[in-house]
């Protein structure tokens, strides 16, 4: 985003005039102050025309200015809200008044004054003292048109936040959502931990990693693609309820539902299974929505969605048969399923990858109401426990809302010999060219050999959850600085 050079030059000239007059345009501090939101709450019932003796000290950015003669009004905004400032020459004195009314939009100031309500009922602060806290050298985005170019909004998020109330609301919802998710887990006895972001082996998901190099150790390391394996080792160690909320990294494409750097929550509970985790997930999402939005009903693409439990459960086989007209159980080989799909798969795509593709293309977009797709093929779930009544399946679900997958869960595989066989199968897939297959993690297998109790685990995409709660059409709308192509 560029501004006319004469506007920039004019602001620079004002900066130099301030310094010439002995006014510091970038002081060190302002001291104790109140949030504007607190001031508004304290006087929410003030009747029109009433002036109080209640003194307040606030700071923020000047976003509007109007008035003439010996009185003026300015709008001041901080991170909690906006309030009108009433400035009068007979209160401030001529010099302070003139400096105030000639501020540029975007300048940051601190003010002291008393609360009043104008005859129209607008809560205001009668300014008695003020101070420049930061001179803005670039103009704000256009007041009426905002910042409309999508690419600029993502690259210059600070301008987007200044210009668009919808953006500010989105990221308030995001912050509150993360806070409420943590509160829910803490209240249910889970311990928050931190595990390595730089890992000697990547694992816990089917994805390509980012590779980096540690100079002192002279070895390659990987940015984690998931926290799963470390967290399950902690379950082995006796932390029966454990979670981590942080960044994962996957070297994959960018789309409305994918960003290479994303915020993921994983939690594990000893002595639970995928039925218990499904109940917990639907309760968590509904309770977070209620606390953040004040309702469990949201809107996406013009459709109302109720997050109230219980959510629908349907098997993967039933969902694909219903939406794609293919019974995957009747096509148990790669060749048979490819023929039924009328496709020529990539040599690295096995039967499981084809099933996953059917789910993504034919089923996922239709899952508007909250739905658990349950019971997946073992081929695409290397860390899930075999189904208790069908050896060809594993106990796994994925949760979908508004056509978006938001969470994934297993009854965790805790048989070390079976886990070793699964790793060997994944290693073979890796040798055949599947860049998303898992490398063999001997340390994890040895941890399982110590004995891991029956465990249920969940991965919840925080970015996608915020997408659902805000109605955002793309992940990039809910990530402050998303990855860009150029």
Regions found by a protein language model. Name each.
Residues 1-486:
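Class II aminoacyl-tRNA synthetase catalytic cores and aaRS-like
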